[in-house]
Swiss-Prot record:
UniProt name for this protein: Poly(A) polymerase catalytic subunit
InterPro entries linked: PolyA_pol_cat_Poxvir, PolyA_pol_cat_sf, PolyA_pol_nucTrfase_Poxvir, PolyA_pol_nucTrfase_sf_Poxvir, Poxvirus_polyA_pol_cat_C, Poxvirus_polyA_pol_cat_N, Poxvirus_polyA_pol_cat_N_sf
GO BP, one annotated term: mRNA processing
Species of the source: Nile crocodilepox virus (isolate Crocodylus niloticus/Zimbabwe/Ume/2001)
Pfam families: Pox_polyA_pol (PF03296), Pox_polyA_pol_C (PF12629), Pox_polyA_pol_N (PF12630)
Role description: Polymerase that creates the 3'-poly(A) tail of mRNA's.
Family: Belongs to the poxviridae poly(A) polymerase catalytic subunit family.
Catalyzed reaction equations: RNA(n) + ATP = RNA(n)-3'-adenine ribonucleotide + diphosphate
CDD domains registered for this protein in UniProt: polyA_pol_Pox
Subunit: Heterodimer of a large (catalytic) subunit and a small (regulatory) subunit.
Domain of life: Viruses
């Protein structure tokens, strides 16, 4: 069969010249699509339905109809751009579905029985301290505008049941953070969705969108958000949230410290604790203290107890509480500096400089001969050690006291941001970490002004199987 015959067979009709030339360079992909056995694929879809879709199971005939309908969609489309998108979507599905999602229903006898890598801890041991910390952080009135992601899709239950298995089968390329990772540490923690980082977010979401379409008939949309680094989110027809995922390179994935619990990797709880402290420099996170206090207390109790155990530290022991609050802010340059040298000469570098504009850090790195460290969306900043300083990008807002100094809440956030670098590189930082953890209850200072965060440029990028919108990013 020559190329023209192959293209005509794929289209279900004779291709005109513009369409033929557009598809000529896609012949290899088209051949793989045509050679794909839809009957085998149907069996994978049905196994997925029977294992993970507990309610509203669709009839086999309806799932088969949707599968056939999509793989003949090009027969009914005339626009060249849409046909090209269909080719790309179909090619991703036929070449990756089995290893990405199809494998979830295959018995995995190669995996030995795994035991939790964590000790049994008393996660309520420091509840009073955490409660005092969170109450001292209540510096807003809680009346801020509601955050965007309030609506959750009814598809979440179906997706979560798959994601738990997905994280086990793909733990060399995917791991989780957030509430589900804390649930693995402490089963008393409730979770609503599963937050993931992985090396193939786009491929995973395309396959998931197709699986949802075939097994439920529901239509989803994927969107890449410009102001969050390598972040893709999936919505349903009502713009309700289904799942999201951060994309990281394999190099960054391997560099991020993590622990294994029940075959699932989670980000090192110390990194998660520091990130939680850092995020309180955002006013909307401070507003959460008025509406989600109990949840936040349980989460911070869990993380703090694990870190104290892991680093063999105690609250109330040691010296230097509050020392990491020795920071200043240059308003015109939008640069904050933390002097951390007071806690010991062994810390290097001891001066931490936070640029609030990413372009300023990029310029500094570009002018340097030293290699910057990159941890992707985990820190949302590259870091550069140079001339006795550690430079980074602080992507949050910054709270200032009336005299123009960083507010204690933001001082802790800045310290947590830079301590993530030391933890993730394995550099010694125990005295500084102990100092921060003993400084979580901040002095009362309700008055503050807000320094806005860096405004990220870019457009939202849409991928849609239903509307044939395929963009390679």
């Amino acid at each position: 069969m020559n190329n023209r015959e192959l293209i005509n067979r794929y289209l279900g009709k004779t291709a005109d010249q513009p369409i033929y030339y557009a598809l000529f360079h896609k012949v290899g992909k088209i051949k793989q699509i045509l050679n794909f056995d839809l009957n085998v694929f149907l069996k994978l879809l049905l196994k997925n339905r029977d294992r993970f879709l507990r309610e509203n199971k669709q009839p086999t005939a309806e799932i088969k109809r949707r599968l056939t309908h999509y793989f003949t969609k090009q027969h009914r489309v005339r626009k060249v751009g849409k046909i090209l998108s269909i080719v790309e979507f179909q090619h991703v599905i036929v070449t990756t579905f089995t290893r990405v999602l199809g494998v979830l229903t295959i018995d995995n006898r190669r995996v030995s029985k795994m035991y939790s890598s964590t000790a049994i801890l008393d996660y309520a041991a420091h509840e009073d301290y955490v409660e005092a910390m969170l109450r001292s952080y209540r510096v807003t009135d809680g009346a801020g505008p509601p955050k965007g992601r309030n609506k959750v899709s009814d598809l979440v239950g179906y997706v979560i049941s798959m994601l738990k298995e997905y994280l086990k089968r793909h733990n060399k390329s995917a791991f989780c953070h957030g509430s589900y990772s804390l649930h693995l540490l402490n089963p008393a923690i409730e979770y609503g969705d599963i937050d993931m980082l992985q090396t193939n977010s786009r491929t995973f979401l395309i396959n998931l969108a197709f699986l949802i379409y075939c097994n439920t008939g529901r239509v989803t949309t994927m969107m890449k958000i410009p102001y969050l680094l390598n972040y893709i989110v999936m919505f349903d027809e009502e713009q309700a949230h289904i799942v999201d995922s951060f994309q990281v390179s394999q190099e960054i994935f391997d560099r991020i410290p993590k622990i294994l619990i029940n075959d699932i990797y989670i980000i090192d709880p110390c990194v998660q604790l520091l990130n939680g402290i850092k995020m309180f420099s955002q006013v909307d996170r401070l507003d959460d203290l008025h509406t989600k206090f109990e949840k936040l207390r349980a989460r911070f109790c869990t993380l703090l107890e694990y870190v104290l155990y892991d680093y063999d530290m105690r609250i109330g022991e040691g010296s230097g509480a509050g020392a990491l609050r020795r920071s200043r802010f240059a308003y015109s340059e939008r640069v904050a500096t933390v002097e951390a040298g007071a806690l010991g000469e062994d810390l290097s570098p001891a001066r931490w400089v936070a640029f609030m504009d990413n372009a300023a850090l990029d310029a500094r790195i570009g002018a340097s001969t030293r290699q910057a460290a990159d941890f992707g969306p985990v820190t949302n900043s590259r870091f550069l050690e140079e001339d006795g300083c550690l430079y980074g990008y602080f992507s949050n807002t910054l709270l200032l006291t009336p005299d123009g100094a960083p507010h204690p809440v933001s001082c802790n956030a800045l310290a947590a941001h830079f301590l993530m670098y030391f933890v993730m590189t394995g550099a010694p930082c125990k005295p500084q970490l102990a100092c921060l953890l003993n400084s979580l209850v901040v002095p009362e200072a309700r008055e503050f002004t807000l320094v806005p965060r860096d405004k990220k440029l870019g457009d939202h990028v849409i991928l849609s199987i239903d509307h044939d919108v395929f963009i390679d990013f």
